[in-house]
Amino acid sequence: MPEVSVVIPVYNNAGTLPLALDSALSQEGSLEVIVVDDGSRDEIETVMERYTADPRVCYVKNPKNLGAAGSRNRGVAMARGQYVAFLDSDDCWAPGKLKKQLRLLEDTGSVLCCTGRELMTPEGKLTGRVIGVSAVISYRDLLRHNSINCSSVVVKREAALEFPMEHEDSHEDYIAWLKILGKYGPAAGINEPLLRYRLSAGGKSGNKLKSARMTFLVYRYMGFGKVKAAACFLSYALHGVWKYARAFLLS
């Protein structure tokens, strides 16, 4: 059995998928890579033909469009590893990422580990801009600010199965992390840019107002009343103002 199951949802990203796949397959240790195709209309099948000889790679096509969350959930349901690692098809990992995370999970007893990230341009050029993470991320920390990037996460499979990703009209991964930390305790963080995250103006979070609305919905889907949801959202908004003010002052 593999120790880690890497789940890659893909939709019309034939141009970036090979970089993501190669970065996963080059990681040390025992792993499988599950590519879940959500009805792509580009050359995904042609890309995947290059990997048919690798027994670690499993390629499945959704019978109908499930969205990114549903595709990740399908991959988790198929996973055989003790841990699940998520990787979007337009991102990639630095060498040694999984090994470092598995070691930290073992040392800390946490069920979820995330890492820092370096931003890439839409064309795949590294920008040198790094976004770090804290060594320990509590449920309360996460309520104030979602510092956990999905493509950096390694999580115990049982926890991912218990709390699948839901509500794609919000930040579905954020809801899952909150539920996992709420039950199992703090996440462990590695403050190194082991994820290379591709910027995309067309992504779900590209529009700041849309992202803000989605964040408010996260708190509502968590079952918070309007007052508590508004208080959490205010904290989120203030953190965003501080982040951009700090970036401006340091520029």
Model-derived features: where do they sit?
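Conserved nucleotide-sugar donor-binding catalytic segment
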Residues: 77, 130-210
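Cell-envelope/extracellular polymer assembly enzymes that use nucleotide-activated donors
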Residues: 2-5, 32, 175
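Short, acidic, metal-binding catalytic loop of nucleotide-sugar glycosyltransferases
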Residues: 22-31
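Conserved donor NDP-sugar-binding/catalytic core segment of glycosyltransferases
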Residues: 96-127
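Acidic helix N-cap motif at the loop->helix transition within catalytic regions
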Residues: 15-18, 42-50, 92, 96
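Glycine-rich, basic loop-to-helix element that forms the pyrophosphate-binding segment
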Residues: 62-79
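Short aromatic/hydrophobic "clamp" motif used to bind/position activated sugar donors
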Residues: 84
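A conserved acidic beta->alpha catalytic loop
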Residues: 23, 37-46, 64, 88
